[in-house]
Amino acid sequence: MRNVYDIAYELANALKESNEFKRFKAAKEKIEKDEKLKQMVMDFKKKQLELEQKRLQGQEVTSSDVYSLQQLYQIISLNPDIEEYLSSEMMLAKILADISKIIAEAVDLKDEMFGLLESK
């Protein structure tokens, strides 16, 4: 039987070689080279995190909160470099979430890891 850590490293290497990761890495490098774009992305992510923390703490997330974040996204994503960064980041995050779900389901931990309750 193969060592699970060796397989994890193989998966990590496969991810690094994927088109999705390469796209994300290139977009990230562009953002990091431009201080103004970097600050815009950081401000957006900060507001996004604040909204998520509010939700996780059981505080009400108002439609105004959501609208404000959506408006900010629409404004900053007018910049093609930011739009590319955010969309490539979202695609990479989806792949990582899918991989986590596949692993959790394979070892029967889906409910524990994702908080899903099945009615039996």
Swiss-Prot record:
Could you tell me which SUPFAM superfamilies the record lists for this protein?
Answer: YheA/YmcA-like
For this protein, the record's Gene3D superfamilies field holds: YheA/YmcA-like
User: Which InterPro entries would you find in this protein's record?
Assistant: Com_YlbF, YheA/YmcA-like_dom_sf
Q: Which HAMAP family match?
A: UPF0342
Report the sequence similarity comment from the record: Belongs to the UPF0342 family.
Q: What is this protein called?
A: UPF0342 protein Csac_0863
